[in-house]
Amino acid sequence: MNNKVHKLSIIGATGRMGQMLVRAAQEKKDFQLVGLLEENGHDLIGTKASELFPSLEKNLVISDSLDKILKISDVVIDFTNPENSVKVAEEAAKYKVVDVIGTTGFSKSQIKKIQNVSKNTTIIRAGNMSLGVNILTGISAKVAEALDSDFDIEIVEMHHNKKVDAPSGTALMLGDSIAKTKGKKLDNLKDIQRDGIIGPRKKGKIGFSVIRGGDIVGNHSVIFAGPGEQIIIKHNATDRMIFARWALKAAKWGMTAEKGEYSMQDVLNLN
């Protein structure tokens, strides 16, 4: 049992997910918040954290120095943007700091950079941190494996109107798990752009549909449509705190893991 109190810093601490992570960390006795990072030029740089989060220590301030924060941290959690998350991963690796990444929308080259620096530290990167979605991922792969090519596969995802990437990292994670059961890469199977007269659906493709609106936290459905029947598996998130709490579980798991890149499937022992 790992009962050590780990020094934790939150990257993008004043953002939507950053604030959730700060609140979730305060629920945990095995983490001590030592750093709250924001980007250079942010209006809140230098602000006492207790002004935003009254229960935090009064000497903790919002910082823009990644270097200073990494020097005092055991682990960082980052839900920001791809470019920033790559930079954080590269710097965290230099300090051997565990890095939990919940950012989505990475390019192939950015993923490669993260994989390369994971040789020097533990990195946990997931398109979705929740238990339910990761179970959905495993179930979807098993269903896909059991069905023949008569079943068309569609993934439908819904998110709030502020989300900037599409399809969501979760939808791509679901598609990737299904593609692997077929011994193929998702890039060769995914069908995203549909507009106009496109002809009949191509056999074996994995279709993606994207919905953006309101304050939807995150809904994902995997549809297996065959002749005369459909199998629909879905997960709805109603509270962002689930992502924060499971990110903290990933952070604790990462403290005893070997160097390398891991997913939530590893953290939850679902592989």
Regions found by a protein language model. Name each.
Residues N3-L8:
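Extreme N-terminal starter segment of soluble prokaryotic enzymes
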Residues I11-L70, S149-N271:
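C-terminal substrate-binding/catalytic lobe of Rossmann-fold NAD(P)-dependent oxidoreductases
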Residues L21, V88, I114, V143, ...:
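Aromatic/hydrophobic pocket-lining residues that form π-stacking "cages" and hydrophobic walls in ligand
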Residues S73:
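An anion/phosphate-binding loop that grips the pyrophosphate of nucleotide cofactors and donors
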Residues V76-I77:
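N-terminal Rossmann-like NAD(P) cofactor-binding module of classical short-chain dehydrogenase/reductase
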Residues V86-Y95, G102-I123, N134:
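Rossmann-fold NAD(P)-binding glycine/threonine-rich loop
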Residues I135-D150, A166:
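Rossmann-like NAD(P)H-binding beta-loop-alpha module
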